[in-house]
């Protein structure tokens, strides 16, 4: 038995499909299947109920999967401890980002991070919050950049910046010539929202409910770009995070207005596992991002007025 065998087993438990599990481990399906059989022979116990339709684990198999996850987490800690003895900001680093942050933040920070930490090998992964936190907990990811939510409190949270949200309206909307919009003016309005699973949806809904607004349930978007296009088409209005707002106050049929009294904001932070030996690496990364983004949103809000 070796570490790779345990990785195959955990991958199969996660995907419940031999081909997808093999793809995630970057091996052929026969290789993964053969190693699982060897593991069963070595342990003298059946781990799987093999059917033609789906992968079913035996009770012994599920117990071994749970223990394998624990072993793999500890192996990752050992590797982190070893790498900590060398240069802190070098080697591989797997970073997770949520879809409402990654595409808009990365252009601002990636060139700077490559220049500041040239020996750091960054691997970027995009997924929704609950998926990223599960991958962080399992050790697949080293750290995650997301909007801080209750679920992230189980990890170490390092705030990076507070990101304002702006109101996006179509160009011939009655408010199009305003300089800003008090949140109270949204009372009675129905706003377009992202679909379930996006933390931004919950945050935007919270601000809307406090203002007396509601969700337009006729449509739920899968991305911020879809929301933006729906606004441009005159189908409604929405709140967009400032990172996703262009430099111009008006572009492609959409007008962006700052909201006031109160200003809706979300906190973007870097999250990592408690007790990680690479704490100083994450703290240095967070400080570099924080310095790069300092003052950025003041410029965005001024341009929107």
From Swiss-Prot:
Keywords: Activator, Disulfide bond, DNA-binding, Glutathionylation, Oxidation, Repressor, S-nitrosylation, Stress response, Transcription, Transcription regulation
Reported impact of residue 233 to V: In oxyR2; constitutively overexpresses oxyR-regulated proteins
Mutant lacking the gene: phenotype: Hypersensitivity to peroxides. Increased expression of phage Mu mom gene, hypersensitive to H2O2. 2-fold increase in adhesion due to overproduction of antigen 43 (flu).
DNA-binding feature ranges: 18-37
Induction / repression: Negatively autoregulated. Transcription is negatively autoregulated by OxyR binding to a short region upstream of its own coding sequence (at protein level).
Impact reported for residue 199 to S/A: No activation following redox signaling
Modified residues (S-glutathionyl cysteine): 199
A Gene Ontology biological process term: DNA damage response
Regulation: Activated by oxidation of Cys-199 resulting in the alternative formation of cystine, sulfenic acid, S-nitroso- or glutathione-bound cysteine.
Effect in UniProt of substituting residue 110 to D: Resistant to H2O2, constitutively expresses oxyS, probably destabilizes the reduced homodimer
Gene3D superfamilies tied to this protein: Periplasmic binding protein-like II, Winged helix-like DNA-binding domain superfamily/Winged helix DNA-binding domain
Result of changing residue 124 to D: Extremely sensitive to H2O2, almost no oxyS induction, probably destabilizes both reduced and oxidized homodimers
S-nitrosocysteine, modified sites: 199
Disulfide bridge map: 180-259, 199-208
Key word Transcription present: yes
Complexes and interactors: Homodimer and homotetramer.
Miscellaneous section: Oxidized OxyR can be reduced and inactivated by glutaredoxin 1, the product of grxA, whose expression is regulated by OxyR itself.
Name the record gives this protein: DNA-binding transcriptional dual regulator OxyR
Organism listed in the record: Escherichia coli (strain K12)
């Amino acid at each position: 038995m070796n570490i790779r065998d345990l990785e195959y087993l955990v991958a199969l438990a996660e995907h419940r499909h031999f081909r997808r599990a093999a793809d995630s481990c970057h091996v052929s399906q026969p290789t993964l299947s053969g190693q699982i059989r060897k593991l069963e022979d070595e342990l003298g116990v059946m781990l799987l109920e093999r059917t033609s339709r789906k992968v079913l684990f035996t009770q012994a198999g599920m117990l071994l999967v749970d223990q394998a996850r624990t072993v793999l987490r500890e192996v990752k800690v050992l590797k982190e401890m070893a790498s900590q003895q060398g240069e802190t900001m070098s080697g591989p680093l797997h970073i997770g980002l949520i879809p409402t942050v990654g595409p808009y933040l990365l252009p601002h920070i990636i060139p700077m991070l490559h220049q500041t930490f040239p020996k750091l090998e960054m691997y970027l992964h995009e997924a929704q919050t609950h998926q990223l936190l599960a991958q962080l907990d399992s050790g697949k990811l080293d750290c995650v950049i997301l909007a801080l939510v209750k679920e992230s409190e189980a990890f170490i949270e390092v705030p990076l910046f507070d990101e304002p949200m702006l109101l996006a309206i179509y160009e011939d909307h009655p408010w199009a010539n305003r300089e800003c919009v008090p949140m109270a003016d949204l009372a009675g309005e129905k706003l377009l929202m992202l679909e379930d699973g996006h933390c931004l949806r919950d945050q935007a809904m919270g601000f809307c409910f406090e203002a007396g607004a509601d969700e337009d349930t006729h449509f739920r978007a899968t991305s911020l770009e879809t929301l933006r296009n729906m606004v441009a088409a005159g189908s409604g209005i929405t709140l967009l995070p400032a990172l996703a707002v262009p430099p111009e106050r008006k572009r492609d049929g959409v007008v962006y207005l700052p909201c006031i009294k109160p200003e809706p904001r979300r906190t973007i932070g870097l999250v990592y596992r408690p007790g990680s030996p690479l704490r100083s690496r994450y703290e240095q990364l967070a400080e570099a991002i924080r310095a790069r983004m300092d003052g950025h949103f003041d410029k965005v809000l001024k341009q929107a007025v």
